């Protein structure tokens, strides 16, 4: 990682993303915007990296760049989506973030 990994973002397993989109298409109101997200899957980047590294049997390495190099990286530290409108349509994620990552890694492993 090129920063401390404390950035906090909303991630979602693709199967949950698809079911969220279908929920909005079938039950949402035309012209309304919905965030396809799950509050329980909001995670710090360093924790996300740790889950992936643990699965791969690797260690997360932090390489903090100097000021000039870091100028090219995003300054965002938080990008969390509010899922309340989607939840009000009856949608709920079926996979937690760790399960989604492991399932993704298993699929990638199977095709390589």
Segments predicted by a language model, with ranges:
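Glycine/proline-rich active-site loop of Rossmann-fold NAD(P)-dependent oxidoreductases
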Residues: 6, 14-18, 23-35, 40-41, ...
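Amphipathic terminal alpha-helices
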Residues: 97-112
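Non-catalytic, hydrophobic alpha-helical segments
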Residues: 17, 21, 36, 45-48, ...
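Conserved small/polar residues in nucleotide/adenosyl-binding loops
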Residues: 1
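Residue-level preference for well-ordered alpha-helical positions
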Residues: 53, 86-87
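Residue-level signal for the nucleotide or nucleotide-sugar donor/cofactor binding architecture
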Residues: 9-15, 43, 81, 92-96
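C-terminal "lid/loop" region of Rossmann-like NAD(P)-dependent oxidoreductases
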Residues: 4, 33-34, 46-49, 57-78
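Short, hydrophobic alpha-helical segments
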Residues: 25-29, 56, 108-112
């Amino acid at each position: 990682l090129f920063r401390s990994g404390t950035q906090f973002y909303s991630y979602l397993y693709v199967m949950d993303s698809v079911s969220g989109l279908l929920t909005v298409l079938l039950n949402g109101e035309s012209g309304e915007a919905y965030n396809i997200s799950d509050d329980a899957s909001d995670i710090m980047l360093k924790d996300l990296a740790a889950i992936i590294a643990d699965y791969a049997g690797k260690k997360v390495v932090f390489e903090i760049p100097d000021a000039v190099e870091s100028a090219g990286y995003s300054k965002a530290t938080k990008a969390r989506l509010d899922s309340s409108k989607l939840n009000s349509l009856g949608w709920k994620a079926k996979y937690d973030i760790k399960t989604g990552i492991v399932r993704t890694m298993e699929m990638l492993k199977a095709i390589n």
